[in-house]
């Protein structure tokens, strides 16, 4: 999911140009206001960069995300009213390279809001700084989130929110969400239009429901690659059979599922909590959220995203203090609970925030996805990550697309997914 590079798309101003424009505008505004204001203190500027998936880098997406960031910025401005916060959007695929280029010019951002995987890569390349007093910052997180964000006992980035993988559906058509994948198939047979993605990060939840995750994880060890994998075969067979049903359709990306549900071309999809705000804007009260269907004996392998804040390396001492204040305002329990209740599109990273399961079906679904589905696979997660790095997530997605399109057989798909060649460890 969720689940998520620092530079403008073609046609957007360069970072240097943006800074010059803002500096000029700030100077002029200060001069204009100096005669009618008793407080002539010039505002400090804090640059917050964030990334958007390449295929979702549109004006509407940027406006929607900017609106969400604005909620977080308001928390910060309560205690830092004389600060100007400037946000800049970049494509995911460009983040690493452009932060590198900007940092070489001492023009890097003060804060980067991105996914945990991106932030770890930035930290490894010394493009973001560890948090000072890391042990104090880390106290607000669970052991799982500390493990994701800590490198050599230093907090590489500050987790902000968990973005659980859930199901989104039209409650006018789906009266009762399916609790198992067997019920999901029955739902499709009744005429409900179901959408699934062949992206491995979006479809591996079904491998969990079938019980295939342990076998997939075992493939990183070469001695298991030539053994029979009955659960993997069962999972691939389930996907192939699902593709044969009239009302179950497969798409390459999660964004396509969201578009189709919003346009009333689908009734039930797998989604991420980050999609909730957009879908709610377009579907209104017809949108409902539930956990993904489990199997009879095993849980869905719900793949979450984790969003966090990284500290840029080019901040002045004043900007660094402001950046730390911004992150603190957005990761403390009060701020996190406030935004959670307003948006319902994430789970707070701060472990001190209680989730109101009784009053919000959406937050309950997010909470159950993370705590009862995702965390039930703690032992398997490292192996699944390694499998997709070794095999290549793109190659896995291509195989699953070929399978669900009818271009290859179940046996061919199983062979393709289980044959890691010499890349598996001995």
Q: Can you annotate each of these PLM segments?
A:
Residues 65, 365-425:
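C-terminal capping/gating helix-and-loop segments adjacent to ligand/active sites or protein-protein/ligand interfaces
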Residues 114-166, 176-179, 288-290:
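Hinge/lid segment of periplasmic solute-binding proteins
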Residues 89-98, 249-259:
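Short helix-initiation/N-cap motifs at beta->coil->alpha
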């Amino acid at each position: 999911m969720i689940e998520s590079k620092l530079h403008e798309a073609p046609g957007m101003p360069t970072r240097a140009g943006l800074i010059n424009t803002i500096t000029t505008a700030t100077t002029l505004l200060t001069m204009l206001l100096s005669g009618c204001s008793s407080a002539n203190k010039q505002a400090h500027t804090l640059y917050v960069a964030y990334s958007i998936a390449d295929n979702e880098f549109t004006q509407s997406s940027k406006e929607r995300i900017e609106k969400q960031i604005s909620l977080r910025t308001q928390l910060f401005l309560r205690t830092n009213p004389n600060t100007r916060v400037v946000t800049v959007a970049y494509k995911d695929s460009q983040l690493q390279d452009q932060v590198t280029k900007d940092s070489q010019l001492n023009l890097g951002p003060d804060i980067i809001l991105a996914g945990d995987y991106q932030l770890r890569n930035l930290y490894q390349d010394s493009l973001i700084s560890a948090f000072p007093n890391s042990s104090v910052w880390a106290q607000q997180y669970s052991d799982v989130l500390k493990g994701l964000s800590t490198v050599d006992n230093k907090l590489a980035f500050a987790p902000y929110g968990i973005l659980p993988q859930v199901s989104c559906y039209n409650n006018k058509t789906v009266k009762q969400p399916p609790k198992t994948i067997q019920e999901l198939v029955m739902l499709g047979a009744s005429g409900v239009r179901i959408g699934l993605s062949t992206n491995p990060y979006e479809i591996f939840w079904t491998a969990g429901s079938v019980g295939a995750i342990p076998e997939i994880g075992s493939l990183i060890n070469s001695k298991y690659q030539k053994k029979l994998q009955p659960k993997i075969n069962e999972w691939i067979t389930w996907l192939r059979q699902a593709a044969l049903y009239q009302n179950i359709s497969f798409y390459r990306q999660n964004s396509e599922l969201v578009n189709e549900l919003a346009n009333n071309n689908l009734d039930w999809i797998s989604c991420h909590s980050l999609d909730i705000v957009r879908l709610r804007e377009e579907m209104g009260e017809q949108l409902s959220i539930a956990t993904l269907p489990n199997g009879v004996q095993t849980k869905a392998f719900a793949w979450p995203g984790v969003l966090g804040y990284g500290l840029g390396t080019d901040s002045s001492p004043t900007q660094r203090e402001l950046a730390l204040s911004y992150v603190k305002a957005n990761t403390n329990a009060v701020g996190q609970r406030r935004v959670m209740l307003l948006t319902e599109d994430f789970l707070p990273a701060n472990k001190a925030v209680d989730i109101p399961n009784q009053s919000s079906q959406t937050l309950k679904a997010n909470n159950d996805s993370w705590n009862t589905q995702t965390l039930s696979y703690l032992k398997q997660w490292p192996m699944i990550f390694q499998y997709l790095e070794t095999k290549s997530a793109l190659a896995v997605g291509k195989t699953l697309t070929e399978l669900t399109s009818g271009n290859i057989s179940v046996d061919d798909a199983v062979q393709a997914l289980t044959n890691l060649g010499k890349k598996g460890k001995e």
